[in-house]
């Protein structure tokens, strides 16, 4: 199954070759918060490598996900890490950010449909993080939050055809959309249908398979997006 292929795939340690060097290049020795959307290998598989090389202060996961083997191992190996187990309705502030969890509603089984959907308000912008949630989850969230607003979307499930659906994009038209997907991936992400839906909203689209590393900088005056491979640069006033 496609799901199982993602969960059990064995490839080179992207944590060591990509994530850790990128974070260390920014001068980071510790991470105040790390949010894990759900339990798929391509979302949590590099956690142990990251924790080995950088200090993690707090892990944010869906309530119930703490029962999976990886989380149990992390608790034993890194007892000083704080844990925040979240469900829809949870809110908290951290520095200049405000976090609001929109999903999951019930205990997480660490599956795609249990992905954390979170709104992160930073200065004058609001970002929607979506994990691998499907249109079905998006519809439930849109129905429960008819006044939902966000300016930046992290597109769901790597730009899959079954995410970033009409229910969500009819309710909100983001200014920016980010798609995280591998170059020449076996699943054809992002799908043409999803790209068409995002383009119809007027969103400026950035995608890691083409743009490489994407950097988002926010100040009170503007937001700036730059890309490593394509050298794109986009500035928008706040």
Roles of regions detected by a PLM:
Residues 1-238:
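Non-globular, low-confidence helical/coil segments that flank catalytic cores
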